[in-house]
């Protein structure tokens, strides 16, 4: 008889799991943790069937599970109703970063611990942000489509192609990912790097960016915190979103906020899809208010085939830089978050509960971070 059940919900790898053994984040490869879990005397149940609620395999198996592990890239939504139907549930683990798929208030009420592998994919996401910015501002899609379609219209591409140099670029959120985006942007000699966050960056972090810009670009004091979001987006040529999803950020980028942005600005979102109102963003791209929107996160995952972000575009067909949710799940990131999940489970199985402080989202009925809510 097992000590308890661990429910693992991941995306299906299919033939790709056979071709690439490092694809740990798929259901076939199980984060490489099956043997470890079974050695601890626990049962591991795996599934890809997470929807619809309340008739999915997740609903059935969660009822007597002690631990549930899921991922931001294919999230099983641990809703209030699902928590109410799972009396044995004690630990929710996110294989990656971002735990908004868990009803954190309901978890607090039940004193369920929610953890994630903080830092596991911050470099991966920051690199994807940079790639998306460059795809948009350099009109990569326009040139690529001509190349594969047998065309050669240089002017048709160049009329929508710009440099990052001398641009004002901003981030909503300047945490582990947002700061790494700012670090990488310094190399492009921006005019200003702006950030909007509930707390100011440490002076040392700001000085590091300013000094690097002064040394390599001859331009100092480029980093500035902006108190009002509307003021920041009004100045910015490129806006990137790098903050968690919570009640105050849900639907933040709507028609009203977008109206404050520069005409022809670019918006990049690798945080959470629901931070943006899908229809409002699509309309802004279509009208030309936004020159482009890119990212990899969707308000529902997997996104339905008729999601407006799949087909949104501008008159020149170069305004869409969307991908599926891949920014934080490179093979390197998968190795890091698989090991992080194992470390969290080891802390739980040993009854030491000595999780890394930065990995704890809620514990003992209260928030352990201000990223999703105020400490109580």
From Swiss-Prot:
Signal peptide: none annotated. The record marks 272, 325 as: Important for catalytic activity. It is an enzyme of class 1 (oxidoreductase). It comes from Saccharomyces cerevisiae (strain CEN.PK113-7D). InterPro entries: D-isomer_2_OHA_DH_cat_dom, D-isomer_DH_CS, D-isomer_DH_NAD-bd, FDH_NAD-dep, NAD(P)-bd_dom_sf. It is found in: Cytoplasm. The keyword Oxidoreductase applies. The lineage of its organism: Eukaryota, Fungi, Dikarya, Ascomycota, Saccharomycotina. PANTHER family: FORMATE DEHYDROGENASE 1. It comes from the Eukaryota. Its EC number is 1.17.1.9. Induction: Induced by formate. NAD(+) binds at residues 176-177, 197, 244-248, 270, 296, 325-328. Catalyzes the NAD(+)-dependent oxidation of formate to carbon dioxide. Formate oxidation is the final step in the methanol oxidation pathway in methylotrophic microorganisms. Has a role in the detoxification of exogenous formate in non-methylotrophic organisms. This is Formate dehydrogenase 2. GO terms for cellular component: cytosol. It catalyses: formate + NAD(+) = CO2 + NADH.
């Amino acid at each position: 008889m097992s000590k308890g059940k661990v429910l693992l919900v991941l995306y299906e790898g299919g033939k790709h799991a056979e071709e690439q053994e490092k694809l740990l984040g798929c259901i076939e490869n199980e984060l490489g943790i099956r043997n470890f879990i079974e050695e601890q005397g626990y049962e591991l149940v795996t599934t890809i069937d997470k929807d619809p609620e309340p008739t999915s395999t997740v609903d059935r198996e969660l009822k007597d599970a002690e631990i549930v592990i899921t991922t931001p890239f294919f999230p099983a939504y641990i809703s209030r109703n699902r928590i109410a139907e799972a009396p044995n549930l004690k630990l929710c683990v996110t294989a990656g970063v971002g735990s908004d798929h868990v009803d954190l208030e309901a978890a607090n009420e039940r004193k369920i611990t929610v953890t994630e592998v903080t830092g596991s994919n911050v470099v991966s996401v920051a690199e994807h942000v940079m790639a998306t910015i460059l795809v948009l501002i350099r009109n990569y899609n326009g040139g690529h489509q001509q190349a594969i379609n047998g065309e050669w219209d240089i002017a048709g591409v160049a009329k929508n192609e710009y440099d990052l140099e001398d641009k004002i670029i901003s981030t909503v959120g300047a945490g582990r990912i947002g700061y790494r985006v700012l670090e990488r942007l310094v190399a492009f000699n921006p005019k200003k790097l702006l950030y909007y966050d509930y707390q100011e960056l440490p002076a040392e972090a700001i000085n590091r960016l300013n000094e690097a810009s002064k040394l390599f670009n001859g331009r100092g004091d480029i980093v500035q915190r902006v108190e009002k979001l509307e003021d920041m987006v009004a100045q910015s040529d490129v806006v990137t979103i790098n903050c968690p999803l919570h009640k105050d950020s849900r639907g933040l980028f709507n028609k009203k906020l977008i109206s404050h942005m520069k005409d022809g600005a670019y918006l990049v979102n690798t945080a959470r899809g629901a931070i943006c109102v899908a229809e409002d963003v699509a309309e802004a791209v279509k009208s030309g208010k936004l020159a482009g929107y890119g990212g990899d996160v969707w308000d529902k995952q997997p996104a339905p085939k008729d999601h407006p972000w799949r087909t949104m575009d501008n008159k020149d067909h170069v305004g869409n830089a969307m991908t599926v949710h891949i920014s934080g799940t490179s093979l390197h990131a998968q190795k890091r978050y698989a090991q992080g999940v194992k470390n969290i489970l080891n802390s739980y199985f040993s009854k030491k509960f000595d999780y890394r402080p930065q990995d704890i989202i809620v514990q003992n009925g209260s928030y352990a971070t201000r990223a999703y809510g105020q400490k109580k």
